[in-house]
Amino acid sequence: MFLNKDASVKKEPWYIHQLTQNELKVFVEESRTGKTNDKAFIGTIIPDAAQRIEAICGKKVKKIMLESEAVRHSFKKAGHNLKDDDLLHIVDVINTTKDIKVSDVTHQNNECLEICTNISGEITFVMEVRIHYGGWLALVTCYRLNRGGATL
């Protein structure tokens, strides 16, 4: 699905097909070692979460995407302390957490949000707000403050 190895099979655009949890797991695994920058539509933002985000940054967002480059960036830095399945929680975290703030950092001139929660320790997802094409949140990076009691 992600890497169309058979050119005779017409590939559906990434923004049409929302990945299942199993497809997301495969996408993350392939992205960690791949060299291309593939994109994946991984979930929708529920209305309550969309309202919280709009109240914080003033922008409407509806969907969540991952780019393999952001996955590689998040996992290649040892200081990020990520577990193998951390990115599989991203949609649930965005839709349920109330700890959202505008980041001091921008990505490609777009505003970013820091979305923090506790999944066996504090984890932060830095999401770029892309208002084009109906409004998307895209992962920039992800990190844990500690892992297994260790501190940075």
Q: Each predicted region: which residue ranges?
A:
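Ribonuclease/tRNase effector modules and their secretory precursors
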Residues: M1-L152
